[in-house]
Design a protein with these regions (language model features):
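Pre-Walker A adenine-sensing motif
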Residues: 35-46
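Walker A/P-loop nucleotide-binding motif
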Residues: 48-73
Length: 155
């Protein structure tokens, strides 16, 4: 059944580029956005908090790719400097609920919460306590946050 596949010439050079979480090594024509976002988040390399950022634009213009690209470089640099910087990326459309978004925050810092059953306030308290006890800077990315608002009917 699979012999033909194993012998055949692959259609793709690299199937990884088809994954929805793939970020290329280079982002052509996004140098200005990369530089600008990099400047905003760079204070964490010296142990300071960075500003909150709200990025919006049309679908497919590279917002997520730029953010993931810059933050991967930031984490790499922080590691070289011995800084405690972590990134928690959450696609709110995929997470679906505020509870799952908060539980993703918890998971990113090693705090376990049950899949369901706790009040949102309790999950947030566990996250806050866990974050404070670990003494690290956490950058949280909430991609497609509008999905949570639309699902709640607030729009």
């Amino acid at each position: 059944m699979f012999d033909r596949f194993l012998r055949g010439v692959p259609i793709f050079k690299d199937r990884e580029v088809l994954r929805n979480d793939y970020v290329p090594d280079k982002l052509p024509h996004r140098e200005e956005q990369i530089r600008c976002f990099g400047e905003i988040v760079s204070p964490v390399l010296k142990g300071s908090c960075c500003s909150n950022v709200f990025i919006y634009g049309k679908t497919g213009t590279g917002k997520t790719a730029v953010v993931k690209y810059v933050l991967s470089k930031l984490v790499q640099k922080a590691s070289e400097l011995g800084s405690s910087v972590e990134v928690c990326y959450v696609n709110c459309r995929l997470s679906g609920t505020e509870y799952r978004v908060l539980s993703s925050f918890c998971e990113s810092i090693g705090v376990t919460v049950p899949f369901t059953g706790l009040a949102l306030g309790e999950v947030f308290d566990r996250f806050r306590k866990g974050l404070n006890s670990r003494r690290l800077l956490l950058i949280v990315v909430l991609d497609e946050i509008d999905a949570l608002i639309k699902d709640r009917g607030d729009v």
